[in-house]
Amino acid sequence: MSLLLENLIEEDTIFFAGSISEYDDLQMVIAGAKSKFPRSMLSIFNIVPRTMSKYELELIHNENITGAMFTTMYNIRNNLGLGDDKLTIEAIENYFLDPNNEVMPLIINNTDMTAVIPKKSGRRKNKNMVIFRQGSSPILCIFETRKKINIYKENMESASTEYTPIGDNKALISKYAGINVLNVYSPSTSMRLNAIYGFTNKNKLEKLSTNKELESYSSSPLQEPIRLNDFLGLLECVKKNIPLTDIPTKD
């Protein structure tokens, strides 16, 4: 499936998450290119979570994790091949926490989407680009760990010439072109779906607690697109009202 999710954004690529300027950076991409992970809004920014590293991992925390995922109901239905079957809360959880998924990148409290650079286009230069298209049904999924998990960072001063597997049952704070995300490895063994939220046509969030509410929401898609500025406001609202994990990082 293309990294640009259908029914999630407009036809053109509207963002880029940095270019590959060095061979080492190319290796970093290769280190995660074959990883299996659930597609989400982060795929728009060409974020491919890595399953290997050439740095030593340093333990920085052992705690419970709460993180977020943005996607659309269409994306999940399409990836699950549901056809005319109804999308349920159980199906959403099974999609993200499929045992075949090696890694799941999560938005956390110090994930800053303003670091994203709008891609220049010869046809249009509108910086307030569309994130979720009119007619789509975007959702916000909140995940949390069942118990405390070790959180690591890469020691950039300990580079090796070879890549080694990061391993299972751990989390790694990673940065992709200025965007901090928390990668959780073997998420099916440590994570659970805590809540699902839909987007109202007033750019607010509403909790979807039952399959009936989920079905009702899917039958009332967005009447207007959600653009970058509105999305950034929604993300800040999420951070203020949902205690996402905060992991301070040094650039």
Curated annotation (Swiss-Prot):
One of its GO terms (cellular component) is viral capsid. GO terms for molecular function: structural molecule activity. Pfam families: Pox_VP8_L4R (PF04498). It is found in: Virion; Host cytoplasm. InterPro entries: VP8_pox_nuc-bd (IPR007586). Induction: Expressed in the late phase of the viral replicative cycle. Undergoes morphogenesis-associated proteolysis which cleaves the 28 kDa to a 25-kDa product. Proteolytic cleavage of major core proteins P4a (OPG136), P4b (OPG129), and VP8 (OPG098), which occurs at a late stage of core formation, is required for production of infectious mature virions (MV). Keywords: Host cytoplasm, Late protein, Virion. Its main location: virion. Residues 1-32 form a propeptide. The keyword Cell inner membrane does not apply. The record marks 18-19, 32-33 as: Cleavage. Disulfide bonds: none annotated. Belongs to the orthopoxvirus OPG098 family. Major core structural protein. This is Core protein VP8. It comes from Vaccinia virus (strain Copenhagen).
